[in-house]
A protein has these predicted regions:
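C-terminal effector modules of nucleic-acid-centric enzymes and ribosome-associated factors
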Residues: 1-201
Length: 201
């Protein structure tokens, strides 16, 4: 339990390596393949359930691993009503124990895309509500911590950014983020680093 704090470490405080775009696409496709093979949304699954058999044959998982993978997909589908993929993005909103609103966008695009998307959304929300908010991103989605007074129809979250303005919004967000200065210094240090001796010279 985060006790009112952001649920994960904000991504600009400790950037971890993100999944590649290719791996993110394959993970999302695997989830989609499992979801399409579901016959019954009830757990526990019988050993002969179609997605379990498929995972054992195609992905070389053992029985328990295949069942856990399918149960993971079932649990998410039970809560969200669908399985988030790169073709089906799900927005979810709930109030935490402290009364703050959490907006979660389930989008398995990988950390690189989700960090950029999260920064741009954070900037848009800050401008729209005149309120500094926390954002965190993972390989599987984005979390925005909003106040209890910030209300909007959930489906409008996808209209906060569009292809015409996203570059400008993201540029403004990155320039104001501590991540920009940290990365700038890191890159400048690496660019100026000279080896003392190379081949005896």
């Amino acid at each position: 339990d985060a006790q009112g704090a952001p649920p994960t470490i904000p991504f600009w405080r400790g950037e971890a390596p993100a999944r590649t775009a290719d791996l993110s696409r394959e993970v999302a496709r695997l989830k989609e393949d499992i979801a399409h093979r579901l016959v019954d949304d009830q757990a526990p699954l019988p050993a002969s359930a179609p997605p379990v058999r498929w995972l054992r044959q195609e992905c070389c998982l053992d029985q328990r691993g295949a069942q856990q993978a399918v149960e993971y997909i079932l649990a998410g589908k039970a809560v969200l009503g669908t399985v988030p993929t790169q073709h089906t993005i799900v927005a979810e909103r709930f109030f935490d124990e402290s009364g703050g609103m959490q907006l979660v966008i389930h989008a398995p695009f990988g950390g690189r895309v989700n960090r950029a998307w999260g920064l741009a959304l954070q900037k848009r929300f800050c401008v729209a509500f005149d309120f500094e908010l926390q954002a965190a991103a993972t390989d599987e989605g984005i979390v925005l911590s909003l106040g209890e007074k910030h209300s909007f129809p959930l489906d409008t979250v996808f209209a906060f950014l569009n292809a015409k303005t996203v570059r400008e919004v993201l540029t403004q967000a990155v320039l104001q983020a501590p991540m920009f200065m940290t990365r700038w210094r890191w890159n400048a240090t690496r660019a100026l680093a000279l080896l003392r001796f190379i081949g005896g010279k």
